[in-house]
Amino acid sequence: MSMQDPIADMLTRIRNGQAANKAAVTMPSSKLKVAIANVLKEEGFIEDFKVEGDTKPELELTLKYFQGKAVVESIQRVSRPGLRIYKKKDELPKVMAGLGIAVISTSKGVMTDRAARQAGLGGEIICYVA
């Protein structure tokens, strides 16, 4: 049985790992997951990430905590395999009035909603992180 939505699985592993106060979570790696992890690291939601293994690469995310509380308060999948959500540059949402981020897959790669607005790009909204 193959996994239907690997990105939702990644987000769930992050959510569950932080709820259980884990230091790190591992998952099967892909280019899109690495790109999402890179955005989360740049925005300060995770400490670090690394890819290990040649035949079956594993992505390991080091989770981030501040004063014993998880940095990621909520992480929510938006576009899913059964219902893709695309937005034009003018329609890009602001998560929690700008306090959170929307991770967006554009023609220039995966980036935050702020970066997409500055670049004048729309795309598929992968998830909201706050």
UniProtKB/Swiss-Prot annotation:
Keywords: Ribonucleoprotein, Ribosomal protein, RNA-binding, rRNA-binding
Any one Gene Ontology molecular-function term assigned to this protein's record: structural constituent of ribosome
Origin superkingdom: Bacteria
Ribosomal protein recorded as keyword: yes
Coiled coil: none
Gene3D superfamilies per UniProt: 3.30.1370.30, 3.30.1490.10
Subunit structure: Part of the 30S ribosomal subunit. Contacts proteins S5 and S12.
Role: One of the primary rRNA binding proteins, it binds directly to 16S rRNA central domain where it helps coordinate assembly of the platform of the 30S subunit.
PANTHER family given in the database record: 40S RIBOSOMAL PROTEIN S15A
Family stated for the protein in its record: Belongs to the universal ribosomal protein uS8 family.
Name this protein carries in UniProt: Small ribosomal subunit protein uS8
Organism: Cronobacter sakazakii (strain ATCC BAA-894)
Underlying gene: rpsH
